[in-house]
Amino acid sequence: ECLVGSEMCIRDSTYTANALVNSILSEFAERASRYKAIVEYSIVIGRSLNMEDIDLCRMLTNILENAVEGCQKVSEEQRIIRLNLHSKGNFLFIKCENSCNEDNLRITNGKYKSSKKNSDKHGYGLKIINGIAEKYNGILNVQVRGGFFAVTTTLCLDENND
């Protein structure tokens, strides 16, 4: 578990034996600390996962990028990101919650839309996450409740994935 939010941020922290995941988590802990966000990681995965590195990278970076951006829209004392990443057997469970300003969220036809300027050029993160979830026969759930935006997915990491 890592708590980040002060000027004392430890670079190159070890969250897991998986080098790719560790690198991504370190980068986003550092990025979140620049915005005074508290980051809590609960990581229980092996050194390797039966998942293409590019998919793992795209999944985690899009989830965490959205979380960091969401936190910027609330006051500093409310900024928090919680990431749970657990593997068991052939399954990978990911849940990321971040504080958010529910008034800033835009929903069109049941889908969350980017609140950035030029939103037609943004908002691909959840589409990418959903595409990867589908590739690994997984499910994706997006929920907003009590000032938190939550992305949850469970992926099946077996040999039969395309």
Where are these regions (language model features)?
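Conserved short strand/loop->alpha-helix "switch" segment adjacent to the catalytic nucleotide/phosphoryl-transfer site
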Residues: 13, 17, 39-59, 117
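Short beta-strand/loop element within the Bergerat-fold HATPase_c
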Residues: 78-90
